[in-house]
Swiss-Prot record:
A GO term from the CC aspect: cytoplasm
Gene this chain is encoded by: tsf
NCBIfam families from the UniProt entry: tsf (TIGR00116)
GO terms of molecular function: translation elongation factor activity
Major localisation: cytoplasm
InterPro entries xref list: EF-Ts_dimer_sf, Transl_elong_EFTs/EF1B, Transl_elong_EFTs/EF1B_dimer, Transl_elong_Ts_CS, UBA-like_sf
Pfam families: EF_TS
PROSITE patterns named in the record: EF_TS_1, EF_TS_2
Organism: Hahella chejuensis (strain KCTC 2396)
Ranges annotated as spanning the membrane: none
Primary role: Associates with the EF-Tu.GDP complex and induces the exchange of GDP to GTP. It remains bound to the aminoacyl-tRNA.EF-Tu.GTP complex up to the GTP hydrolysis stage on the ribosome.
Keyword Signal in record: no
The protein's name in its UniProt record: Elongation factor Ts
Length: 286
């Protein structure tokens, strides 16, 4: 049987909101597989989708640069080890160099960008500051109109590309994406695999109702439709005017959303947590 650690139980609790014993039991039954434990819990308890894996725990900033004619824009993420360094003017100057290079070269290839003198600057900054600095990723969008939005703390940045429309509309939609975090532009972008997995979970939940098969099928179809609407940008209520769907707002402007990119600092990265009390206790014993 797989060993179930306290950190595994803690992560499952944070992602599901369920109690410690329930999470531990689910992990034991899933032989330590957190994703399988979540799927089993959803089937058995009707729990909503869990939070995404990979808590945001790395520091750093995101930055964007948009062309004067709003035809293209770039976004980059640069990580530091601490929030203190993420506010350092030397670090922020380096971030400016990175986003500037990506913009000038119209490139999202981090490895290629670093070969243009940025790697030497990064190494010098690491020596000066005493923390590891990492240029994690970059993206570029180009279209009729490209808008960008950076949240005030420089931890969330969005690019959105439109056919038609204008810069103000693009920025409003980018702000919405930052706030609501849709996973797809349209339900048509959701893979059959994702839908099939959700359908399996919803059917397992609905089967527990004891209702006839045709009623269960209708229940599942309704839940799938709601799920797709919640994760699709065009079907979400616009954050600045909840009475209007984003898709209707875009259509009224004679525009079309063709692409979006949303960066949040550290998403998918988890720094090693150090239990200082345990570390000290171990040293005292040793």
């Amino acid at each position: 049987m797989a060993a179930i650690s306290a950190s595994m139980v803690k992560e499952l609790r944070e992602r599901t909101g369920l109690g410690m014993m329930e999470c531990k039991k689910a992990l034991v039954e899933a032989e330590g597989d957190i994703e399988k434990a979540i799927e089993d819990l959803r089937k058995s308890s009707g729990m909503k989708a869990a939070k995404k894996a990979g808590r945001v725990s790395a520091d750093g900033v995101v930055a964007v640069k948009v062309s004067d004619d709003n035809s293209y824009a770039v976004v980059v993420e640069v990580n530091s080890e601490t929030d203190f360094v993420a506010r350092d003017e030397n670090f922020l100057g380096f971030v400016g160099d990175v986003v500037g290079a990506a913009f000038d070269k119209k490139s999202a290839d981090v490895a290629a960008l670093m070969e243009s003198g940025l790697e030497e600057k990064r190494q010098a900054l690491v020596q000066k500051i005493g923390e590891n600095i990492n240029v994690r990723r970059a993206s570029m969008l180009s279209s009729d109109v490209v808008g960008a939005y950076v949240h005030g703390n420089n931890r969330i940045a969005v690019l959105v590309a439109l056919n038609g429309g204008n810069a103000e509309l693009a920025k409003d939609i980018a702000m919405h994406i930052a706030a609501v975090n849709p996973q797809f532009v349209s339900r048509d972008d959701v893979s059959d695999e994702v839908i099939a997995k959700e359908r399996e979970i919803y059917k397992a939940q609905a089967d527990q109702s004891g209702k006839p098969a045709e009623i269960v099928d209708k229940m599942v179809d309704g839940r799938i439709n709601k799920f797709l609407a919640e994760i699709s940008l065009l079907e979400q209520a616009f954050v600045k005017d909840p009475d209007v769907k984003v898709g209707d707002l875009v259509k009224k402007a004679g525009a079309q959303v063709v692409a979006m990119v949303r960066y949040e600092v550290g998403e998918g990265i988890e720094k090693e947590e150090v239990d200082f009390a345990a570390e000290v206790a171990a040293q005292l014993k040793g």
